[in-house]
């Protein structure tokens, strides 16, 4: 009889504990709400009022094609459409709920197999680095996002601090992977949006650079510092802009293992030994001032902390803001309220 009472007591305590956890305001938020049609929201990771909004971009429609204005470009104000079947990559800045498009800065995309330096088309993803995905493997909660990139078998997990986006990529066992860094990509893109870009390899685990863009904000400077959990094996890039004179290069080629590059249409790749270590953690810090500022932000907010610690901290930050408001209602009503409140803080 005593054993039965103990079991009942333990089950009751467990139920109370689970109920208390489920009743946290952060658990009612659904970042997927608003991502279809003209809702103009994104499902990715960010913190309350943070600068970084790390989220998947499923496509972009140029502002104009051959001089003709494209009115459907505004469907991608936030870079993501729920109806889409492919992901181009993960960029670090997004607008939420606006009627205008911009940002989509510093896009990363992990991959295996042949290196492809163009995004490809949604109807033919094999021609580029984009990947198919399924919403069944997608998870979006405040401060955290994950998805399986079906074409590569890569699990992508994202979280964020105020000024840093953190990626965790798990590659298929036994396969070497690479990381694409696209400094051309943008939301509401058009030829000439990127005024200038720079990429510098500081060492085999640290990259720095910047890009200057015209958009809703003119001459917008975005500096970055990228920390890598694995050393780079080798790397290269492609400048998609036709240059009349490339200088006197003598016997070496700057397209591979360069120390520093600049241009307006830079897309780079970095190879890693993921066959022996399948996890790659990438921390990308931003600054509006300098690459030195980006490095300082990286050290201040993300250095020495695991992906899991940072994801839990982002969740805690969101719950701390949301719990200032207590409401009564059904679970659906609470989901509507706290998701709307969440969107006011992005």
Residue ranges and their predicted role:
Residues 1-23:
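Bacterial Sec-dependent N-terminal signal peptides
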Residues 23-346:
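Accessory carbohydrate-recognition regions in carbohydrate-active enzymes
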